[in-house]
Amino acid sequence: MTEKEEIVRKGYDKIAEKYQADRHLFNNIKELEELESLLPKNAKVLDVGCGAGVPVTKFLVDSGFDVIGVDFSENMLRFARKNVPKAKFIKKDMTKLDFRDNSFDGLTAFYSIIHVPREKHSSLFQSFHRILKPEGVILICVGPDEWEATEEYYGSRMFWSHYSPEKSLQLVKDAGFQILFEKHLVKGREKHYWILARNKK
């Protein structure tokens, strides 16, 4: 794990309680419903950078899906296991997803890719392609503009790393995905760039 990634892990361990208390402000139900409509019944879904499990992991479980959440913050996972007891949670670095090929029907990554050093984004999207089944679907968000910085967030140091939306979209396409929608959305006073895409193998 790089120094920048360690800043993120330690930061979320420190702010876990405050952060999870504000998750209701980030309502992406419409986008999640679009994802839900594209997945088979009883789909197996991976929530990458699941945090405290709300609202994303909970929505997926409530939709009847078999859900695994991964995060490298132990404190976030502690809340996730309490908030969504029907999901399975694993402590794991999202840049080292060692699941078998074609393991999942769907994958979500909300507010997590933005903390991964951008030079790793290409290989990250390629790993999504590998572990998703053919025709599997991803719903992810990335930064709204090109930017990299370490700043204070909820009273703790935090690291962000973004490419431009155009660059991010191209990396997703290059990884083997067909774009279903891409758009800027403001949720909880924050703007992000959202991508829904289908895996092509």
Give residue spans per PLM region.
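A short glycine-rich, Lys/Arg-flanked "PGG" loop and its adjoining helix->strand segment in the class I
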Residues: S122-P134
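A short acidic, Gly/Pro-enriched loop at the edge of an enzyme's catalytic core
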Residues: T95-L107
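Core SAM-dependent methyltransferase catalytic element
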Residues: H184-K201
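Conserved class I S-adenosyl-L-methionine
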Residues: M1-P40, E146
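A short SAM/SAH-binding and catalytic strip from SAM-dependent methyltransferases
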Residues: G106-E119
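Class I SAM-dependent methyltransferase SAM/SAH-binding core
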Residues: L46, A52-K96
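Conserved beta-strand signature within the Rossmann-like core of class I S-adenosyl-L-methionine
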Residues: E135-V142
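Acceptor-substrate binding/catalytic loop of class I
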Residues: T150-E166
